[in-house]
A protein has these predicted regions:
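C-terminal motif of bacterial Sec signal peptides marking the signal peptidase cleavage site
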Residues: 16-19
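Bacterial signal peptide processing site
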Residues: 21-25
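Immediate post-signal peptide segment of exported/extracytoplasmic ligand-binding proteins
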Residues: 44-85, 104-105, 240, 244-251
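Short, polar/charged alpha-helical segment
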Residues: 75-108, 201, 206
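Periplasmic solute-binding protein
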Residues: 79, 148-151, 172-218, 256-278
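Extracytoplasmic "Venus flytrap"/periplasmic binding protein-like
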Residues: 106-178
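Glycine-centered hinge/linker elements that transmit conformational signals in sensory
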Residues: 231-234, 264-312
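Extracytoplasmic/periplasmic substrate-recognition and gating elements
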Residues: 340-344
Length: 344
């Protein structure tokens, strides 16, 4: 029974992903070169059809339960891409409803979801007790790693029909997540949170104008956008607004830096914390001259005199919207809090 349920669950995951793709085709060329005598404007691209290899089978209205994250403090970090019980006119909600209906009809299943604030703890407790209520577990990645090291997760590369090489999976993530030739987690079109939680840096357009600062857009185009340049711009804005001789959340800052901003800057600089050896095992790789240089610059930027570090989401939004921060580091999904500002 458990084997049948497991196969059904993984078939469902594969079909959920293929339904997200909408039957798209990918434009490709034979070798990436162009004949100088060919009018390229009239050459039609070759279309390669993306196929879904799934068995023709009906599972008799079996329920497949997803365990997902409910962030009670910040709902934008909750899962909204797995289940909804009705259409409401919102794009993501209605797309999920339609997709699930297609999958349920194709496989003869019922998709269900349990949202939990501590999804990984619930998964661990159930699995330890031999409870098979949950078929697919989708905690935050750092928590998923804990479950993998404790032996609770399957090697996805061994799963029939999951087809991690398909374009609806994020191939880069899958490649990076291979540990000792096993893949315990991946992501792709099945999740929008992995995109919405991308760390970004917003800037206040009004402050750029008021202080006659260089445009971040132009700096990027001219390939002069560096950590040093960010620090230079930030220092031009920082000042003691209330004149009490102390720098607090009531003053003006070059940057409000989230708790995870240093790691984001470090990785964005092209550095890594671990690499893999020939056998796919992780090797600690901090300590090179460049990594030390990058860390020094990152810490100076995020923890220095021109940055308010780890102020919390609410304070950071208030400071930015009141024009008292040039830069703010957030996840992309946090953009909803900045609607009162002219940001870039």
């Amino acid at each position: 029974m458990h084997k049948t349920k497991r196969t059904l669950t993984l078939l469902l995951a594969a079909l959920l992903l293929s339904a997200c793709s909408g039957g798209n085709t990918t434009d490709t060329t034979a070798d990436g070169t162009t004949d100088a005598n060919v009018d390229t404007a009239e050459t039609a691209p070759v279309e390669t059809e993306i196929t879904v290899e799934l068995p023709d089978k009906n599972y008799g209205d079996a329920e497949v339960m997803f365990l997902t994250v409910q962030n009670t403090g910040m709902d934008q970090y909750s899962s909204h891409e797995i289940y909804t019980d009705e259409m409401n006119g919102q794009l993501i909600n209605d797309a999920v409803y339609v997709r699930n209906g297609q999958v349920e009809q194709a496989l003869g299943v019922r998709i269900a979801e349990s949202k939990q604030p501590d999804a990984e703890k619930v998964a661990r407790s159930n699995l330890t007790a031999g409870d098979t209520t949950f078929d697919v577990v989708m905690p935050y990645m750092n928590r998923a790693i804990d479950l993998a090291t404790e032996g609770f997760l399957m090697d996805l590369s061994t799963v029939p029909y999951l087809a991690l090489e398909k374009p609806w999976w994020d191939g880069r993530v899958t490649k990076d997540m291979v540990i000792a030739n096993k893949v315990f987690f991946s992501t792709g079109d099945i999740s929008i949170l992995d995109n919405e939680c991308t760390m970004v840096m917003f800037f206040n357009k009004d402050l750029i104008t008021d202080y006659s600062l260089e445009s971040p857009y132009e700096l990027v185009r001219e390939k002069r956008w560096t950590i040093d340049k960010v620090g230079e711009l930030a220092s031009a804005v920082t000042h003691d607004v209330d004149g009490d001789g102390k720098m607090t959340s009531k003053d003006a800052w070059g940057m409000t830096a989230a708790f995870n901003a240093p790691v984001s800057f470090y990785i964005a600089s092209g550095e890594r914390i671990v690499n893999k050896d020939a056998d796919g095992n992780l090797q600690f790789c901090l300590g090179t001259d460049r990594s030390v240089d990058v860390l020094t610059k990152v810490f100076s930027l995020c923890l220095g005199d021109d940055a308010l570090y780890n102020a919390g989401y609410g304070d950071a939004v208030t400071i930015f919207n009141e024009g008292r921060a040039l830069f703010v580091t957030f996840a992309l999904t946090d953009i909803s809090g900045l609607r009162e500002s002219e940001y870039g």
